[in-house]
């Protein structure tokens, strides 16, 4: 579904991300780990085509991103951030906002909102305003808002790092259940290797702006690709 080859992304004149080769299969959940500032978020921005490489490229369904119409491509993806970024309106209107911009009929939009508000456990909150939500509730709304768009590719940038550990664990459990049933291609950035191992089909390790290793979680722990990966694992 996604192929990355000889990718080089620069920001402010410096190398921000280097990826020699990476294949992401349809329906796969890839967890991305690495130190702060390593280039994890840059990978998501490149996949969203919000920043463009200076060399190499990314293909989506065999077609280079540079050849996709930006509007057409962005209809196929959804982004979930650490900050839910909810608007000052009801939960229902927040979830449906993207559908409104896409011209989805009200009946279809309502059906989708109900489906995903149930899946994310916020159906009882639909009439509540965003400012009245807890951190965990707000992030559940953010997830529902992403899924309601029916994206082919879901990009998640440390979406649960701002909530308490108990809420985080429950959110991950619920999201894992949804993805197990939904089989949606997902790239999930996290600092937590244990979390990555539970959530991801594979784990990608980015260190010093370079993709160092992509493997099954247990293989990375026992067979780090080089000393930088080994040192990163030892610091966790």
PLM segments and residue spans:
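Catalytic Walker B motif of ABC-type/P-loop ATPase nucleotide-binding domains
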Residues: 154-158
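ABC ATPase NBD coupling module
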Residues: 64-78, 101, 223-224
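The feature captures the beta-strand-to-loop junction immediately N-terminal to the Walker
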Residues: 33-35
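Conserved ABC ATPase signature
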Residues: 129-133, 137
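Helix-to-loop junction immediately C-terminal to a conserved catalytic motif
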Residues: 48
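Conserved ABC ATPase "signature" region
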Residues: 107-125, 176-177
